[in-house]
Amino acid sequence: MDKLVPVIPAKEKSFPAIPSSARHAILVPSVRFDDNSRSIIGSLIGIANEETIVLIADNSENIEKKRFLEQIRAINPNIFAVHHEKNIGGQGNFDYLFDWSEGVEFTALMADDDWISPDYHVSAFRYLEKMPHLTGAAVGNSIIMHGSPRERTVDGSQPQMVGETPIERMRKWSGVTSRITMYNASRRSALKNAAAYIRRTPIPAITLLEDLWETNRLALGAFVTKPGKGFLVHNPTPTSSWQDIYQRLHGDSALPFSYIYFSALSTAIQLGIFHTGTLSPLKTKNDKTVCANHLFDHVFKKQFLATVGGQEKVARSQFSKHPRVLEGFLKYCMPPFPDQITFDQNILEWYISLVDALETKPQNGEVPLSEKFRQFSSDLLPTFQLETL
């Protein structure tokens, strides 16, 4: 078996062959090359085999990292790796790995800046094999490292999200801990809709991948947590500043830095689009309506309003020349707030008008970002008659 790590040319999407015996794939989108990332990748040597393979897509543009991955493959050839000639971004790297693992029944993510004991995923894969009604499982313990030195360790294990119906499962979901549970083992079939949506949306959003991934699973089946010896340690602090988040999500887009304060609004809106529209994993109109409204309201209030709610003075100053945007802000973002804020055509059109007001318009005849998002939304929501800006 060839131990070399192939270089994937820019704008090309070729995949090294993986064995037909593979049933589990641990996906590692990687960009770092430090002591921690080397330790994480090296820890996988002991568990990769013909049934449980490891797929690493390297975005580092570091030739030393490529050589390191070849040394890893020389020890265990069931760890497969590619080296992107040019960094294709975090979302592009996720898309690459998800496509590469097509045909493998079970999958899980592993970051190169957190720590997951190798048996954490293997135990969950084995549990899912025995329980065909489940879409995801965590077998072990999740720990979040943040805060002051005396309060750094927090239990991040998410409650079991089980129930007879999708809404029963989604009511137990939290848009915060999905950043941890997205790493847990899943049936690949329970992630396809979310992956298709992420690939098509023209506007990324804060925790959008995590939230779509998680709620796609919950639409189809239960997520359980079980005791085990394995563990996941999540360290969110290195990318916690607004500037870091902006650069990661929108640094090369037409959106200004001020848009970052509306990124959670985008997440809420796109959860509504996903679960209402043609890519929704939900089967009935009632399930789509109830679940989309619940998820939209949850993220809108817990994440978006917690940041900008009630800031009338700032909104009047920023949107003084955009009366439609200001009107929507005063309607949706000022108290008193209703018990549930509903996802509908009006609030979607307000969001699109917000993007239109904030974006830098292209000068070369290209379609503005707001219009791209309007077209994208119209394609997925054929019952909505969205206005052209």
Feature roles, as predicted:
Residues 121-154:
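Conserved donor NDP-sugar-binding/catalytic core segment of glycosyltransferases
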Residues 57-69:
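A conserved acidic beta->alpha catalytic loop
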Residues 9, 32-47:
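Short, well-formed alpha-helical segments that are part of the catalytic scaffolds
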Residues 73-89:
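Conserved donor nucleotide-binding strand/loop of the catalytic core
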Residues 104-115:
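Short beta-strand-to-loop acidic/aromatic patch adjacent to the donor-nucleotide binding site
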Residues 84-102:
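Glycine-rich, basic loop-to-helix element that forms the pyrophosphate-binding segment
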Residues 156-177:
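Short, flexible, basic/aromatic active-site loop/helix in glycosyltransferases
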Residues 190-194, 202-227:
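A short, conserved alpha-helix in the catalytic core of glycosyltransferases
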